[in-house]
């Protein structure tokens, strides 16, 4: 019997499951939103929130623990320098799962988007904001 066993198996071996979740965490922290199936997103949420909580502690031991999962120095740096500070003063709830209406073609699996709740400004939006500011100053003068 499988009473009180936490985590989903996804019909994969332990090493495959660990690699899959590790890759999904890397993708979520890189792109800040990904499209996946609902059970995978629910499992990914706990892994990602634990890493963001480590980023809030921001000490050497936390960086080493994060590196064990991410295995990418650039991504660890981004997690601790960019993503972590966005959530200062928050008490969890760093990710959001949005269910999609259309299931996946082929196997009709329920799909969703998992994203960070406080996403970075898109570079296109920042560029548009900076180009509008000088134009407004020229009109005032």
UniProtKB/Swiss-Prot annotation:
Q: Which InterPro entries match?
A: Ribosomal_bL17 (IPR000456), Ribosomal_bL17_sf (IPR036373)
Parts of the chain that traverse the membrane = none
Q: Which UniProt keywords apply?
A: Ribonucleoprotein, Ribosomal protein
* GO cellular component: a single term: cytosolic large ribosomal subunit
Query: Lipid metabolism among the record's keywords?
Result: no
Q: Which residues form a coiled coil?
A: none
Gene Ontology biological-process entries: translation
| One Pfam family linked to the record | Ribosomal_L17
Highest taxon in the source lineage: Bacteria
Kindly give the SUPFAM superfamilies that the UniProt entry links to this protein.
Prokaryotic ribosomal protein L17
Annotated signal peptide: none
Q: Which GO terms describe its molecular function?
A: structural constituent of ribosome
Subunit note: Part of the 50S ribosomal subunit. Contacts protein L32.
- Family, as annotated: Belongs to the bacterial ribosomal protein bL17 family.
This chain belongs to which protein, by name?
A: Large ribosomal subunit protein bL17
Q: Which organism is it from?
A: Maridesulfovibrio salexigens (strain ATCC 14822 / DSM 2638 / NCIMB 8403 / VKM B-1763) (Desulfovibrio salexigens)
């Amino acid at each position: 019997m499988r009473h009180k066993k936490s985590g989903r198996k996804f019909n994969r071996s332990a090493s495959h499951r660990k690699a899959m979740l590790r890759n999904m965490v890397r993708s979520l922290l890189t792109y800040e939103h990904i499209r996946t199936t609902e059970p995978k997103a629910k499992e990914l949420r706990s892994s990602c929130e634990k890493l963001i909580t480590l980023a809030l502690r921001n000490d050497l031991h936390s960086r080493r623990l994060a590196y064990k999962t991410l295995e990418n120095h650039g991504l660890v740096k981004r997690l601790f320098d960019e993503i972590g500070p966005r959530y200062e003063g928050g008490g969890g709830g760093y990710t959001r799962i949005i269910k999609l209406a259309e299931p996946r073609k082929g196997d009709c699996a329920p799909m969703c988007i998992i994203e960070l709740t406080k996403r970075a400004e898109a570079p296109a939006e920042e560029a548009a904001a900076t180009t509008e500011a000088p134009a407004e100053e020229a009109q005032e003068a």
